[in-house]
């Protein structure tokens, strides 16, 4: 099982830079992500629609593909538990002031750590640099 953040999940459906490498990695194992990654993923597609990067018909196809894959169990969506939220609070208590960590990225990192993952895959430099504060190794194949 491999933990992907949303920046990697989007590349499974949209031809952003590095999509081929991410898809090859995804084909090698089952995928997991924090449950809120579903909202982040469709929000990323909506942003592409809003920015004019995709047309409404393509947007509808993307959303349909995501829904079909979710219903088929293509991803393990990990719900946020009290333990995950506690871990986030504790991480921020100890986090050096120099570390830039968004709340949604902290949810990814704490979810991965509490679920027993040792690595997280992302293209987000802030998430990758903060991974060590959750006992994780951040990896990027792009």
Regions found by a protein language model. Name each.
Residues 35, 81, 142:
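Residues at the C-termini of beta-strands that transition into short coil/loop
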Residues 32, 78, 139:
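General small-molecule cofactor/ligand-binding pocket signal
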Residues 24-27, 71-72, 114:
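Short glycine-enriched loop/turn motifs at secondary-structure junctions
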Residues 42-91, 133:
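Active-site-proximal, substrate-binding regions of enzyme catalytic domains
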Residues 8, 43, 108-111, 127:
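Hydrophobic side chains within alpha-helical segments
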Residues 1-40, 44, 48-61, 134:
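Short, well-structured N-terminal submotif of metal-dependent ribonuclease cores
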Residues 1, 68, 113-142:
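Acidic, PIN/NYN-like endoribonuclease modules and their adjacent C-terminal/linker elements
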């Amino acid at each position: 099982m491999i933990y992907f953040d949303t920046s990697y999940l989007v590349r499974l459906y949209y031809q952003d830079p590095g999509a081929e490498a991410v898809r090859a990695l995804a084909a090698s194992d089952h995928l997991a992500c924090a449950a809120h990654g579903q909202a982040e993923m469709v929000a990323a597609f909506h942003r592409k629609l809003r920015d004019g990067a995709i047309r409404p018909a393509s947007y509808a196809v993307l959303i349909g593909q995501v829904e079909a894959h979710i219903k088929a169990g293509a991803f393990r969506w990990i719900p946020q538990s009290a333990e995950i939220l506690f871990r986030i609070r504790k991480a921020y208590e100890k986090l050096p002031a120099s570390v830039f960590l968004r709340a949604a990225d902290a949810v990814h990192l704490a979810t991965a750590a509490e679920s027993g993952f040792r690595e997280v895959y992302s293209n987000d430099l802030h998430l990758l640099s903060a991974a060590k504060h959750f006992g994780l190794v951040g990896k990027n194949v792009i």
